[in-house]
Design a protein with these regions (language model features):
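N-terminal secretory/targeting leader peptides
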Residues: 2-25, 30-126, 136-254
Length: 254
């Protein structure tokens, strides 16, 4: 295999299962040792499951094929909590972060639109928008204001409606629910009387088990099975509508 892979070819071979964005900051320079740069990548997701495996595979491929760049992937909670991955980049503690744009609503009012819009585009349409419709450039303006650069890294596709501890038969059944639902989907269920809660992946099952939330939306049946959400809730609904396709985010400071 050629060592100088084109960016798009390399990302395809990385096996990334979520969508991501890379951001560049000038706050900190990467370590240099033995003639190559060393980057730290902070993930907003746990090591297990498709998202953790994706970013780990991405890092492994860089280390395998690149002579000038080496990376160390830290999964959620290993270096910083998952929701602080982008903050680690902006502070200079890491060169890259991998997560979902809707994890950072405290940093930008517009950033949630990069990740998911209720009743919005499917994965193929969103990828087409990114690469052929000016999506990357539009997202980059949002990320540049934060001192980072956006690059897409896959897409989870349409997601499910979520796991609930009671039956949902009408919109009124959302009233009073505390539900793990990030992004614009969370704002939508808030209009129905629910309280949206922002949680990183590793925190979803503990919150659902303890009763800190009454319901939780994650990804899809396969990923939700791996996350063990069936252990904490009886009712599973889909397909999702308020939480459509999810773009994952990867930010770097170099």
């Amino acid at each position: 295999m050629k060592k100088n892979l084109k960016r798009r070819e390399f990302l395809k071979k990385a096996g990334v299962a979520g969508a991501a964005a890379v951001g560049a900051s000038t706050l900190a320079a990467p370590a240099i040792a033995g003639g190559h740069q060393e980057w730290i990548i902070c993930s907003a997701f746990g090591k297990a499951g498709p998202l953790g495996q994706a970013i780990q595979g991405f890092g492994d491929n860089i280390n395998r094929y690149s002579e000038k760049l080496k990376v160390k992937v830290y999964h959620a909670g290993e270096l910083v909590p998952g929701l602080e991955a982008l903050d680690a980049v902006r502070s200079g503690a890491a060169q890259a972060a991998y997560g979902a744009p809707y994890y950072w609503p405290n940093l930008s009012d517009a950033i949630e639109f990069v990740a998911t819009c209720p009743f919005g585009m499917n994965a193929m349409e969103q990828n087409a928008w990114c690469y052929y419709g000016g999506g990357i450039e539009a997202a980059d303006k949002i990320y540049n204001a934060l001192g980072v650069k956006f690059l897409p890294m896959g897409n989870t596709g349409n997601q499910m409606g979520g796991w609930f501890n009671k039956e949902i038969n009408t919109p009124d059944d959302y009233k009073g629910l505390k539900m793990r639902m990030p992004g614009l989907g969370g704002r939508t269920i808030e209009k129905l009387g629910a309280t949206p809660v922002l949680l990183a992946g590793p925190d979803v099952l503990p919150a659902l088990t303890s009763g800190a939330v009454d319901a939780a939306e994650w990804i899809c049946p396969a990923a939700d099975l791996g996350a063990g959400l069936y252990q904490a809730a009886k009712y599973y609904y889909g397909p999702g509508s308020v939480s459509y396709t999810h773009l994952r985010a990867h930010e770097t400071d170099s």
